Amino acid sequence: NTGGKAPRKHIAHKQAKKSSAAAATGGVKKPHRFRPGTVALREIRRFQKSTELLIRKLPFQRLVREIAQEYKSDLRFQSQAVLALQEAAEAYMVGLFEDTNLCAIHAKRVTIMP
């Protein structure tokens, strides 16, 4: 015995009931749904592989200009300066979420809270 899960036992009458129910409703098959958390884990893996910025550039640029306006009016930004700010902001947020996740795991929770 190699361990692991035992093979599932298929019950014939349950399968027959399902197929007859689909035939009774006119063959309308309900849409496929992944189990809760599966899509989230897939997205986590996808975003961890990628290096592109996740916040849209123009909304971030508007936010930077809005915040800078409070300190000095008529400021101009090089495009590289805004990109550097965005890289720093996203790196900070990723670190914050990593720490938040560790705190949630420590508290025996799965969901992170504000």
UniProtKB/Swiss-Prot annotation:
Residue ranges for the region (Disordered) are 1-32
Keyword terms of this UniProt record: Chromosome, DNA-binding, Nucleosome core, Nucleus
- What domain of life is recorded for the organism? Eukaryota
The UniProt GO MF terms for this protein read: DNA binding; protein heterodimerization activity; structural constituent of chromatin
Q: Where in the cell is it found?
A: Nucleus; Chromosome
- Asked if the record carries the keyword Zinc-finger, the reply is no
Q: Which InterPro entries match?
A: Histone-fold, Histone_H2A/H2B/H3, Histone_H3/CENP-A
Q: Where is the composition biased (Basic residues)?
A: 1-17
Query: Bias category Low complexity: which stretches?
Result: 18-28
One Pfam match, given by its short name, reads: Histone
Predominant location: nucleus
Q: What do the Gene Ontology cellular component annotations say?
A: nucleosome; nucleus
CDD domains linked: HFD_H3 (cd22911)
What this chain does, per the entry, is described as: Core component of nucleosome. Nucleosomes wrap and compact DNA into chromatin, limiting DNA accessibility to the cellular machineries which require DNA as a template. Histones thereby play a central role in transcription regulation, DNA repair, DNA replication and chromosomal stability. DNA accessibility is regulated via a complex set of post-translational modifications of histones, also called histone code, and nucleosome remodeling.
**Family classification:** Belongs to the histone H3 family.
Output this protein's name. Histone H3-6
